[in-house]
Amino acid sequence: MDALQLVSNRSETDVPALMHALGQQARASAHALSLASTEAKNLALRVAAEQLRKRTQDLLLANARDLEGAKAQDANAAFLDRLTLDDKRIEAIARGLDEIAALPDPVGRMLARYERPNGLVIERVATPLGVIGIIYESRPAVTADAGALCLKAGNAAILRGGSESFFSATIIHACLTEGLRAAGLPEAAVSLVPTRDRAAVGEMLKGLDGTIDVIVPRGGKSLVARVQAEARVPVFAHLEGVNHIFVHRAADLEKAAIIIRNAKLRRPGVCGAAEILLVDEACMATHLAPLTRMLLDAGCAIRGDAATQTIDPRVTAAMESDWRTEYSDAIIAVRVIDGLNKAIAHIETHGSHHTDCIITEDQEAADRFLAEVDSAIVMHNASTQFADGGEFGFGAEIGIATGRLHARGPVGLEQLTSFKYRVHGNGQIRP
């Protein structure tokens, strides 16, 4: 274990050797964890939650250290919000661990069972994926959510958090380790990469000599693009949230205002925040001005098209890039668009297939939007900030997968399993 003691980004660290050791220990732990009882896994999670509550002050001090470093790098307000922990957020992290412990164990779940004419009984049963590498940026809570979900689904996890949240993640990981120890499970089942050296990411993307089965990136566009370009193992891609709200001609104005304000401004830095507002030309005369002024008065900057710029001098002109930008801040792009067909086409062209919403009282229009918009999550009359595993009843999530293979939408327990076939015979041979 000496090679895995906490280190920083010192040049003398042998990163390939360090990561190779992590991979080997994770692979050995994965087998033991795949056979672990539900009771042991739940105990580990409950003890980890208890440790988080006990070590709140330690975590706040570590987080203050992270915030100091981020401010020194001139991080913006949305970034600092994602990084910040307080008593309430720490309790939410601990409660999330308890909630994952309370969820049904997905491992061993019978997915299908049938009998063939020759008497063979075939069962499809959920199994762990193996070793999951998770690469993420500034959110300290991801350390707990990702580690806990992988653990409950019987997977070993190698967590590589952002350098900005290094000290916070270290305390959270220590709490998870205490839980594993208390439950008699391998401590290396959830590993935190103990260096901020960026070379560690490159080693993970190579697969650590075949020890990593899947990579899950959670972060900005540049991180996900690098992972997709360089990874030699399968990837659950979590692309940026260029999320749209389309205000249809049959939208209730009061309902639209409430939804849009929440979707943009509740927490502008989360991946489910709305970034683009499309207003149907047919309701522009009644809806555009009040919605625009509501956002401006609430402190949201607007990048608008020509029609939106005439509403208020505080609106600045949108550039072409604004229609495909994840601001992660109190900024939104607003455009008037000619009906449902054009709105769907705009989302297909400029969106990231993450989360998109229509606001309308016309059920036929809503049904078309839900059927034709090819995003992981499509919504009708609800805030895009519900794009969250916890809100979906998954307990938590590792991210929102925007690809089309295996996992799509919130990646929770079920998405962190695969399956195998069990075949029961009574001496049958194939003719």
UniProtKB/Swiss-Prot annotation:
UniProt cross-references to HAMAP family, sorted A to Z: ProA (MF_00412)
Q: What does this protein do?
A: Catalyzes the NADPH-dependent reduction of L-glutamate 5-phosphate into L-glutamate 5-semialdehyde and phosphate. The product spontaneously undergoes cyclization to form 1-pyrroline-5-carboxylate.
| Pathways involved | Amino-acid biosynthesis; L-proline biosynthesis; L-glutamate 5-semialdehyde from L-glutamate: step 2/2
Instruction: Give the family from UniProt.
Output: Belongs to the gamma-glutamyl phosphate reductase family.
UniProt organism field: Beijerinckia indica subsp. indica (strain ATCC 9039 / DSM 1715 / NCIMB 8712)
Q: Which Gene Ontology BP annotations are present?
A: L-proline biosynthetic process
The protein here is known as Gamma-glutamyl phosphate reductase
What EC identifiers does the entry list? 1.2.1.41
Highest taxon, organism lineage: Bacteria
Q: Which gene encodes it?
A: proA
The answer, when asked if NADP is one of the entry's keywords, is yes
EC class (word):
oxidoreductase
Q: Which UniProt keywords apply?
A: Amino-acid biosynthesis, Cytoplasm, NADP, Oxidoreductase, Proline biosynthesis
From the Swiss-Prot or TrEMBL record, state where the protein is found.
Answer: Cytoplasm
Question: What sections of the protein cross the membrane?
Answer: none
Give the CC-aspect GO terms: cytoplasm
Q: Name one GO molecular function term.
A: glutamate-5-semialdehyde dehydrogenase activity
Q: What is the lineage of its organism?
A: Bacteria, Pseudomonadati, Pseudomonadota, Alphaproteobacteria, Hyphomicrobiales
Q: Which reaction does it catalyse?
A: L-glutamate 5-semialdehyde + phosphate + NADP(+) = L-glutamyl 5-phosphate + NADPH + H(+)
